Design a protein with these regions (language model features):
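Short, well-structured N-terminal submotif of metal-dependent ribonuclease cores
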Residues: 1-31
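Acidic, PIN/NYN-like endoribonuclease modules and their adjacent C-terminal/linker elements
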Residues: 30-32, 102-138
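Short, active-site-adjacent cap segments at secondary-structure transitions
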Residues: 7-8, 37, 115-117
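PIN-domain endoribonuclease scaffold, especially VapC-family toxins
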Residues: 23-26, 33-82
Length: 138
């Protein structure tokens, strides 16, 4: 389950995009519509702040779909109360990412420390390939 900061990194950088491309054939990359819209909201300012088109990326979030699938509210709303209870006051705006992870039993890929301690496996970019390279459970 991708957080908005991972979507931004995938759009503006190379490392996250490379990881997604490398594992796309065998992994499913999902994000709630709220994280997608949050990334869309912040990207123009980030592109402008950098004053250049970063490494050939144009800041266009839509270049990620596919391989990233955007989930609608009906997927994560049933787990919303559990997600809000777990993420608490840390960042209540992130509850949809956590709710998706809870509803679908997926880990979260983020750089945001607010997801740690929520009861869902949480991976940062520097460690996520360990997850992708683990042998599948029998």
């Amino acid at each position: 389950m991708l957080d908005a900061n991972i979507l931004i990194r995938a759009t503006l950088g190379r490392r996250v995009r490379r990881i997604i491309s490398a594992h796309e054939p065998s992994a499913e990359f999902l994000t709630p519509n709220t994280a997608y819209e949050e990334a869309r909201k912040h990207l123009p300012a980030l592109v402008k702040k950098r004053a250049v088109i970063h490494r050939g990326m144009d800041g266009n979030l839509d270049t990620l779909t596919p391989p990233v699938s955007v989930l609608d509210r009906d997927v994560y709303t049933p787990a919303g109360a559990r997600a809000l209870a777990r993420i608490g006051d840390r960042d209540p705006d992130d509850w949809p990412v956590l709710a998706c992870a809870l509803a679908l039993d997926y880990p979260v890929w983020t750089e945001d420390r607010n997801f740690f301690g929520t009861g869902v496996a949480t991976w940062t970019t520097d460690r996520v390939e360990l997850y992708f390279n683990e042998p599948a459970a029998s």
